[in-house]
A protein has these predicted regions:
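Glycine/charged-rich beta-loop-alpha catalytic/anionic-binding loops adjacent to active sites
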Residues: 58-69
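Gly/Ser/Thr-rich loops at beta-strand to alpha-helix junctions
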Residues: 45-47, 99-104
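N-terminal short beta-loop-beta anion/metal-coordinating cradle
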Residues: 19-60
Length: 222
């Protein structure tokens, strides 16, 4: 058993002691329930941990992570997380966060057989196909990778918006709002891509409307 593994439990002990020293009831209150305002959908990369980069405390962020922060509506795992967060936790914000130097995005741009990863990365290859003209015009390979990371976040945000539970709650309560972020590993900063949530709603509702209502007008006339 490696020393680094044992350190985990030592670190946990110190963390517990520090929390109890700050607030003796911390874990008693934490165990009761959770009321996060945020659903964070991010990459599984070990360098991009949600709570740390957001400066969030336990109970403040509901987190789902996978390779390259993909939201595939045929994937029961991601759709179940989103539906639970929207309908039961009543989150107000859904954040899709990618990061530069993403291995999953780079793998999707590599012409090779990656076995079981192939169907997963196909979602990102589809993003490239949708934006091929723009991406192919970027001569610098690293900048092209960075741009694909951003476009992947954008398209995954759209996949979130396509879900019926997101549409229905937005009409009723004006939430959740979907945001697209990129975490820059080179600087440690979060970049808000400032995705226009309402414009996307308006642009895609003719095809992806699952509620029978005009999303934007229903909200404005309440």
């Amino acid at each position: 058993m490696s020393q680094s593994y044992e350190v985990i439990f030592e670190n946990n002990k110190k963390w517990v002691e520090s929390k109890v020293a700050e607030d003796p009831d911390f874990f008693h209150e934490l165990a009761k329930t959770q009321h996060p305002d945020y659903l964070y959908i991010g990459c599984s990369d070990s360098r991009a941990t949600a709570e740390e980069l957001m400066g969030a405390k336990p109970g403040e962020v509901f987190v789902y992570r996978n390779i390259a922060n993909v939201v595939n509506t045929l994937d029961m795992s991601s759709t179940a997380v989103i539906q639970y967060a929207v309908e039961h936790l009543k989150v107000k914000h859904i954040i899709v966060c990618g990061h530069y130097n993403c291995g999953g995005v780079k793998a999707a741009m590599t012409p090779q057989d990656l076995g079981l990863l192939n169907p997963w990365l196909r979602t990102i290859r589809d993003v490239y196909r949708l934006h091929q003209t723009e991406l192919d015009s970027i001569e610098d390979e690293n900048k092209r990778y960075d741009r694909l990371v951003e476009l992947n976040v954008q398209e995954q945000c759209i996949n979130v918006i396509k879900m019926a539970c997101v549409q229905e709650r937005y009409i009723l309560e004006e939430y959740p709002i979907v945001h697209g972020w990129v975490f820059d590993l080179r600087t440690g900063k979060i970049i808000d891509l400032e995705i226009d949530f309402e414009k996307i709603l308006k642009d895609i509702q003719k095809i992806y409307n699952l509620t029978g209502s005009d999303w934007v007008m229903s909200r404005k006339t309440k």
